Amino acid sequence: MEFSMKFNATARSVQGSSASRRLRRAGRVPAIVYGGTAAPLNIELDHNEIYHALRKEEFHALILNMVIEGGKTEEVLLRSVQWHAYKPQVMHVDFQRVEANQALHTKVPLHFINAEVSPAVKLSGAIISHVLTELDITCLPALLPQFIEVNLGDLLGGGSIHLADIKLPKGVTFNAHGGDTNPLIAAAVVKGGGAADEGDAAAEQPAA
């Protein structure tokens, strides 16, 4: 992995709703780390630190270095975040431990490039629709990509990009859902194309 992020955590011994409310009033966030061979670990985080970290795409996709107060570091993956119903407040966070020899099942963001120079945009004035913005994948921790690139440079007006059209990084496999092994990734929608097609079809009908 070429890029990593770290965050600070403190082990907590007090649990329960009342304790969690006290933590939040003090600017802290209750969280838990689970998985691997160790027992689940209840931790607390600084709200401002985790709030700003969660605004970064890579914090949701990469293996993170969790630095526990006292010097111990563990590799973890963000699994879920609970937000306040109407305030910009992080209520609870779940992390999963990472074991080097155990495959990860996670989602990785897609980065779309070269749309502006594609024939679809330059020649046809198409609008690029991103049908998927992330992929559900499986890989070993050392092979987890920060993102997967989708090159739209050759896309034609009315054309599309499917999973089979992009190259997955080494050691990364796609997790198919519902039997769809080649999902639609992006499509070039030509403005007014549908209406024009219907008009052409009508013009081709023989007169009664």
Swiss-Prot record:
Gene3D superfamilies cross-referenced by the UniProt entry: Ribosomal protein L25, beta domain, Ribosomal Protein L25, Chain P
GO biological process, one term: translation
Domain of life of the native organism: Bacteria
GO cellular component: cytosolic large ribosomal subunit
CDD domains assigned: Ribosomal_L25_TL5_CTC
Pfam families registered for this protein in UniProt: Ribosomal_L25p, Ribosomal_TL5_C
InterPro entries: Rbsml_bL25/Gln-tRNA_synth_N, Ribosomal_bL25/Gln-tRNA_synth, Ribosomal_bL25_b-dom, Ribosomal_bL25_C, Ribosomal_bL25_long, Ribosomal_bL25_short, Ribosomal_L25_dom, Ribosomal_uL5_bac-type
Keyword Ribonucleoprotein recorded: yes
Keywords: Ribonucleoprotein, Ribosomal protein, RNA-binding, rRNA-binding
GO molecular function, one term: 5S rRNA binding
Role this protein plays: This is one of the proteins that binds to the 5S RNA in the ribosome where it forms part of the central protuberance.
Summary of subunit composition and partner proteins: Part of the 50S ribosomal subunit; part of the 5S rRNA/L5/L18/L25 subcomplex. Contacts the 5S rRNA. Binds to the 5S rRNA independently of L5 and L18.
NCBIfam families in alphabetical order: bL25_bact_ctc (TIGR00731), PRK05618.1-5 (NF004130), PRK05943.1 (NF004612)
UniProt record similarity statement: Belongs to the bacterial ribosomal protein bL25 family. CTC subfamily.
Protein name as catalogued: Large ribosomal subunit protein bL25
Record gene name: rplY
